[in-house]
């Protein structure tokens, strides 16, 4: 396995998040807590080609995953590259900002095991869990926003009372968290870099929300990515008590119950 010099640099600048991708919007009902680490979705990317089971390419992937796993004790975002040309292996893995180290490492093991089962021979494949997401690709995408692959989930319960007022206040709170996550005061190389979560009182109810970007993005691109997925709020979650939109580059979630660790 060969690792580029930039890979080591990226590993030392590791951090945290939870994302994974899908090519067409998908609607699900969700009522999940952080403790469950529920499987959310996966995608097998056919356009990047395939490899044979038992091939050197497959062995190289496992070696790279094992190598990156050892860094999770210090970081919750890891990125690695192995190979040259069409046989490139690019791995990005990130845990959600509130996920503890042990859960983060466990999530990587679970994600890698499941994606091998769901997309056994695809070079490009992504899987999302509540606590993490794993992105395997033959294309180098470090620092780039993925606009192609995204999906949404929503809480089956409808908002009671004034839905327009709720939507307006919820959207404003998400943008407030976006500003915090992408602020220059947000220090790189810490667990919750490019992550923000909080609680807001809306009359008699409390709104809980979080936003996060993958830590390979610049602060500017984090803002761009979150602005982009928030445009999907009307189709995702209008009138719902909770919802989320996820892409491989950023995501947000809101609920009327706590779902992140303090």
UniProtKB/Swiss-Prot annotation:
GO CC terms in record: extracellular region
UniProt entry tagged with the keyword Nucleotide-binding: no
Keywords linked to the UniProt accession: Repeat, Secreted, Signal
Entries under InterPro entries matching the protein: CRR_secretory_protein (IPR050581), GNK2 (IPR002902), GNK2_sf (IPR038408)
Keyword Transport tagged: no
Cellular compartment(s): Secreted
Boundaries of every Gnk2-homologous domain copy: 39-141, 147-259
Signal peptide: 1-29
Family membership: Belongs to the cysteine-rich repeat secretory protein family.
Name the record gives this protein: Putative cysteine-rich repeat secretory protein 24
Organism name: Arabidopsis thaliana (Mouse-ear cress)
Source lineage: Eukaryota, Viridiplantae, Streptophyta, Embryophyta, Tracheophyta
Designated gene of the protein: CRRSP24
């Amino acid at each position: 396995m060969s690792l580029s010099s930039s890979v080591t640099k990226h590993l030392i600048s590791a951090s945290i998040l939870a994302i994974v991708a899908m090519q067409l919007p998908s609607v699900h009902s969700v009522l999940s807590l952080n403790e469950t680490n529920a499987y959310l979705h996966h995608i097998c990317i056919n356009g990047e080609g395939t490899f044979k089971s038992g091939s050197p390419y497959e062995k190289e992937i496992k070696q790279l995953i094992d190598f990156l796993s050892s860094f999770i004790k210090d970081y919750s975002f890891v990125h690695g590259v192995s190979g040259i040309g069409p046989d490139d292996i690019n791995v990005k893995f990130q845990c959600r900002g509130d996920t503890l180290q042990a859960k983060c490492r466990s999530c990587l093991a679970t994600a890698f095991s499941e994606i091998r089962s769901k997309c056994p021979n695809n070079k490009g494949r992504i899987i999302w869990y509540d606590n993490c997401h794993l992105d395997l690709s033959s294309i180098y995408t470090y620092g780039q926003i993925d606009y192609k692959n995204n999906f949404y989930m929503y809480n089956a319960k409808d908002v009671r009372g004034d839905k327009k007022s709720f939507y307006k206040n919820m959207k404003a709170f998400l943008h407030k968290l976006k500003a915090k996550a992408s602020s220059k005061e947000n220090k790189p190389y810490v667990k919750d870099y490019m992550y923000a979560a909080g609680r807001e009182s809306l009359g008699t109810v409390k709104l809980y929300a979080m936003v996060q970007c993958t830590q390979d993005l610049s602060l500017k691109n984090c803002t761009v990515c979150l602005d982009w997925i928030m445009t999907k709020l009307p189709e995702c979650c209008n009138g719902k008590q909770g919802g989320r939109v996820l892409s491989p580059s950023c995501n947000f979630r809101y609920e009327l119950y706590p779902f992140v660790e303090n």
